[in-house]
Structure formats: C-alpha cells, structure tokens
C-alpha cells in the first residue's frame, strides 16, 4: 500500500519494519519482472532489428527490381512504339494492296464479262459455221457425185466416139483399094473423089477436130480435178499442222469453211466447163447430123 512520508514517520518500529520488508519484496518482484520484461523487450528489439534488416534488404531488392522494371518498361515502350509504327506501315501497305486488288478484281470482272460475251458470240459463230460446214459438205458430196457421173458419162461418150470413128474408118479402108485401081472404064466417072466421098471425108475431118477439141477439154478438166484434189490434200495437211500447233477452234473452223467454199467454187467451175463442153459437143453432133442429112 502507498503511505505518505509523515505516515511512515509516525509508524512504530515493527510496522515500519514490516512495511520495509513488504516494499523490499515488491522491489524484488519488480526487479524480477523488469528483468523479464527487459529480456522480452531485448528479444523483441532483436526481432524488430532482424525484421528491419530484412525489410531494408527487401526494400533494396524492390528498388533494384523497380529500376529493372522501369528499364524494361522503357525498352518495352520503345519496342512497342517501333512495332506500332511498323504495323501502321504494314497496315497502310495492306490497305493499298487491298485497293489495288479491288481494282484488279473490278477489271477482271469487266474482262470476264467481255470474255463471256465473246464466248457466247464464238459459240453462236461456231454453231453457224457448223451449219455452213454441214451444208458445204453436203454440197461437196452432191457435186462429187455429179462430177463422178459426168466423168462416167464423158468416158462413155469418149468410148462411143472411138467406136464411131472406128466404124467410119472401116468404109474408107474398103474404098481405098478401089481408088488405087489404075483401070478406068469409059462409062465410069473420073477417078477423082465424088461429092459424097468428099462430103464424107470433110465430115470425118470435122469429127476428128471436134473429137480432138473435146479430148483436150477433157484432159484440161481432169487436170483441174487433179489440181483440186492436190490442193485439198495440201489444205488438209495445213489444217492438221495448224491444229497441231494449237490455234483457236474458231480460226480452224473459219479456215475449214473457207477451204470448203473454195473447193465448192472450183467444183462448180469445173462442172460448168463440163456442161459447156457437153453442150458444145451436143451442138456439134447436131450440126453433123444436119450436115449429113
């Protein structure tokens, strides 16, 4: 308990001694407790010093880490700026390429439309040329058959004329010994040729001239036919070579149709010459029959 100084002086000796002993015990207890508290405080202080050192070390590490992170951030910022600039350039380049591709696509679409139109025109032209080709082939077949018939008729006519010439030459062979006979009877006419014999000989000469002229025309016609065949073979070879070189289908069809049309025209001209020659031969034969009559 707490007593003032006057109270302590007024206490008797045994109470004062007891109070002293009590104060001494309390002091000892206080020393003991203060020593323990001091030890605890020292240990806590040591712990705090250790934690402080650790915190300082951590702060230094964090500072170093912060500096490193700042440097990295600066480097990253520079790299990001470079990458951003590169991406912008690439974006602008890609945008230009996109615009050029769009323009190219637009031109290709226009060209595709033109090609489709030309393809349709070519298909129509090919169908038209195909029909013309079929018509020309049919006409060529008809003309070839007619030409073959004309050739057969011309050969038959030539054979008949040769037989006619042989039949007209037989009486002359029989009459010639009579002409060479030196004996002349007084009642008989002079050994000169009679009017009938002279007429027959002139007709024979005229027939020979006509036959020679017709033979020449026939040879010319046959030569023209051979030339047409040779030209056809050459045209076929040229067509095969042109087709093998890889020319267009429309150009090949045009050339084939042109060649066929020229062939038809040549055959028409040949047939017209044959008709003219046949008409002239018929006129000559009719003239001969009238003169003989």
Swiss-Prot record:
The keyword Glycosyltransferase does not apply. Residues 36-147 form a coiled coil. Residues 239-293 are annotated as: Required for interaction with unc-83 isoform c. Keywords: Coiled coil, Nucleus. It is found in: Nucleus envelope. Signal peptide: none annotated. Its main location: nucleus. GO terms for cellular component: centrosome; kinesin complex; kinetochore; microtubule associated complex; nuclear envelope; synapse. Expressed in ventral cord neurons, the pharynx, seam cells of the hypodermis and in vulval muscle cells. Disruption phenotype: RNAi-mediated knockdown results in viable animals, but a small, but significant number of animals have nuclear migration defects in hyp7 hypodermal precursor cells. RNAi-mediated knockdown results in an abnormal distribution of GABAergic synaptic vesicles at synaptic termini of the ventral nerve cord. RNAi-mediated knockdown in combination with exposure to pentylenetetrazole, a GABA antagonist that induces seizures, results in impaired locomotion, stiffened appearance and an increased convulsion incidence as compared to wild-type animals. It comes from the Eukaryota. The keyword Coiled coil applies. GO terms for molecular function: microtubule binding. InterPro entries: NUDE. GO terms for biological process: cell migration; centrosome localization; chromosome segregation; establishment of chromosome localization; establishment of mitotic spindle orientation; microtubule nucleation; mitotic centrosome separation; nuclear migration. PANTHER family: NUCLEAR DISTRIBUTION PROTEIN NUDE HOMOLOG, NUCLEAR DISTRIBUTION PROTEIN NUDE HOMOLOG 1. Component of a dynein-regulating complex composed of at least lis-1 and nud-2. Interacts with lis-1; the interaction is direct. Interacts (via C-terminus) with unc-83; the interaction is direct, and is required for recruitment of nud-2 to the nuclear envelope. Part of a complex with lis-1, which is recruited to the nuclear envelope by unc-83, where, in turn, it recruits dynein to the nuclear surface and regulates nuclear migration in hypodermal precursor cells. Plays a role in GABAergic synaptic vesicle localization in the ventral nerve cord. Belongs to the nudE family. This is Protein nud-2. It comes from Caenorhabditis elegans. The lineage of its organism: Eukaryota, Metazoa, Ecdysozoa, Nematoda, Chromadorea.
């Amino acid at each position: 308990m707490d007593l003032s100084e006057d109270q302590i002086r007024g206490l008797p000796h045994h109470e004062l001694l007891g109070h002293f002993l009590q104060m001494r015990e309390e002091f000892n207890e206080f020393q003991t407790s203060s020593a323990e508290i001091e030890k605890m405080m020292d240990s806590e202080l040591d712990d705090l010093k250790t934690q402080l050192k650790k915190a300082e070390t951590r702060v230094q590490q964090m500072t170093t880490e912060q500096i490193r992170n700042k440097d990295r951030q600066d480097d990253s910022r520079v790299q990001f700026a470079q990458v951003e600039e590169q991406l912008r350039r690439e974006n602008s380049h890609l945008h230009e390429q996109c615009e050029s591709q769009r323009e190219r696509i637009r031109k290709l679409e226009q060209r595709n439309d033109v090609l489709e139109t030309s393809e349709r025109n070519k298909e129509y032209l090919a169908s038209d040329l195909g029909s013309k080709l079929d018509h020309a082939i049919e006409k060529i077949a008809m003309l070839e058959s007619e030409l073959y018939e004309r050739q057969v008729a011309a050969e038959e006519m030539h054979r008949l004329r040769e037989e006619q010439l042989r039949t007209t030459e037989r009486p002359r062979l029989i009459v010639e010994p009579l002409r060479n006979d030196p004996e002349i009877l007084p009642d008989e006419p002079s050994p000169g040729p009679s009017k009938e014999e002279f007429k027959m000989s002139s007709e024979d000469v005229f027939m020979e001239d006509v036959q020679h002229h017709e033979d020449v025309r026939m040879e010319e016609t046959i030569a023209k036919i051979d030339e047409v065949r040779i030209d056809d073979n050459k045209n076929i070879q040229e067509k095969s070579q042109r087709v093998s070189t890889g020319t267009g289908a429309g150009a090949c069809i045009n050339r084939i149709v042109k060649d066929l049309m020229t062939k038809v025209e040549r055959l028409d001209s040949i047939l017209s010459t044959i008709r003219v020659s046949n008409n002239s031969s018929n006129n000559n034969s009719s003239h001969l029959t009238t003169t003989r009559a």
